[in-house]
Amino acid sequence: MIKEKANALGKAAGGKAVLSYEVTMNRPTLFSVILKAEGDRTVYGGLNLDVSGGKALEDQDLLYTNSAEYAKYLQGKEYVFAENGIRVASAPEGPLDTMVPYTQLVKAINVAEGARLLTSYKLDSAAEDMTLDLKPGELVALYMEANPTSGNQWVLVDQSSQPGFANLGHSFTLPLLNPTGQAGSPGVTILFASFTQPGDYQVKAVYAKTMAAPLRERVFKFKVR
């Protein structure tokens, strides 16, 4: 795929094009590279490759393409993943010289695959009495035992007083076996979050029915710097 892209750029550049490249990300399952062809003119191209699948990444593999952040920064543009953000082409076939930090894109990151791209932390109730040090843009997954058939669900309490906090949604997993013998559907709710700016954060999650007093609550502390 890289060779095909390089050959296409060489033809687009014209003349006796000279090819060069810059690797912007090299992870076990993700490889991104910028190719440059200098001939009668200079043209650029980018590739994002799924190393484990041996194919080019589709936008929706790592991103929510229906998000406002995707539409604002990435839609219709050529881009590659880098360590601190996404490098975007300023013009068709032009240099990928615009850096969009991940802190501006956290709501566009597909949290199910986010660990391939960003540092991610998995926390459970044992983390309540601790303060976790993070960097802006890193992901947090809070694992909470839940049984939605009881009518209760875990939700994050309003964090509008902490403008750097980003609520990235939730998911629920149901184990194949039920070792506890509980009635209903005991499983784990996963609450996803990130932080876009430095600061000290206190995040509260409550387990409750709608419009009812919480049955349980947990507080997690984070120092982002």
Give the location of each predicted region.
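C-terminal active-site-capping segments
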Residues: 144
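Short aromatic-acidic-glycine turn motif
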Residues: 162-170
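Short tyrosine-centred short linear motifs in exposed loops/low-complexity segments
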Residues: 197-201
